[in-house]
């Protein structure tokens, strides 16, 4: 009834804000569920569930589902869940967990047609839904479920290691071989994210703290200068597209000598002598 819907929203707003207030350094996560916070746990999607998910996200939450691989329209991972994942893709991290415990659930009754005695079918279904949702993390649970992933579907584990989450790298970096003392250095870089997901630098708990930085390293492997490219934002890199940047450092006032140039993603507050 109307009172239930009002109370659900008030309680969810209160509890998510409370957690966000006290857990400021680690990501927070809530299930995206078609009957989120409702007295029932299955059935058609509640018309207010989508706005409740959005409320939790606005209060600093990521989202997860523990029904991946379940295709029942009443309580599985179906059209509503897929739409939520698509809506928030690359905006917040999505975490997957499989719905079936293959050692105790009758997964062969699933509409997907999983074969009895073939848990690898379930793992494949979970993996395929994870790829569609562009999940950042896969939760293999514990015990027998984890063993099943490694024993029944290890090739899928290997695929996620190479394809899932975020996979950032600079495929092109251009710096001059020589510069004059006191001159500026122009640095060009091109970055790609080869993973399904994205680098969640935009989370309020991280607050864009990870930056692309250019360093000059001396013969003792010590960074003598570190310059941050403020226009380079890793959370925007998605779908293997190239993202190119060029920035110019302030004057490099180092003694003449040989230095190794290094470009990396780091948390600048952990470094000394940062220049912008």
Residues of each region from the PLM?
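Catalytic-core regions of glycoside hydrolase
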Residues: 3-144
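A short tyrosine-centered beta-strand micro-motif
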Residues: 254-263
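Short coil-to-beta strand junction motifs in C2/discoidin
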Residues: 200-213
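Catalytic cores of secreted or luminal carbohydrate-active enzymes
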Residues: 125-175
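Single conserved hydrophobic/aromatic residue that forms the stacking wall/gate
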Residues: 264-276
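Structural beta-strand segments of beta-rich domains
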Residues: 183-187
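Short, acidic/polar linear motifs in exposed loop/turn regions
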Residues: 193-197, 220, 251-253
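A beta-strand/beta-hairpin structural motif
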Residues: 224-253
């Amino acid at each position: 009834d109307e009172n239930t819907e009002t109370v659900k929203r008030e309680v969810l707003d209160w509890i998510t804000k409370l957690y966000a207030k006290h857990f400021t350094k680690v990501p927070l996560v809530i299930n995206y569920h078609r009957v989120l916070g409702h007295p029932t746990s299955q059935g058609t999607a509640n018309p207010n569930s989508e706005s409740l998910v959005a409320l939790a996200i606005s209060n600093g939450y990521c989202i997860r589902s523990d029904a991946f691989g379940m295709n029942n329209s009443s309580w599985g991972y179906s059209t509503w869940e897929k739409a939520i994942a698509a809506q928030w893709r690359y905006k917040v991290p999505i975490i997957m967990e499989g719905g079936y415990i293959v050692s105790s659930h009758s997964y062969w009754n699933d509409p997907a047609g999983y074969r009895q005695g073939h848990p690898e079918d379930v793992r494949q279904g979970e993996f395929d839904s994870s790829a569609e949702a562009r999940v950042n993390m896969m939760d293999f649970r514990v015990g027998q479920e984890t063993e099943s992933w490694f024993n029944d579907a290890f090739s899928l584990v290997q695929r996620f290691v190479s394809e899932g989450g975020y996979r950032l790298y600079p495929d092109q970096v251009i710096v001059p071989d020589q510069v004059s003392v006191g001159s500026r250095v122009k640095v060009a870089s091109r970055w790609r994210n080869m993973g399904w997901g994205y680098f969640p630098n935009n989370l309020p708990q991280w607050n864009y703290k990870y930056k692309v930085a250019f360093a000059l390293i001396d013969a003792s492997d010590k960074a003598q200068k570190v310059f941050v490219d403020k226009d380079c934002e890793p959370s925007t890199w998605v779908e293997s597209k190239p993202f190119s940047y060029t920035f110019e450092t302030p004057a490099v006032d180092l003694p003449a000598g040989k230095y190794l140039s290094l470009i990396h993603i780091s948390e600048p507050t952990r470094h000394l002598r940062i220049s912008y």
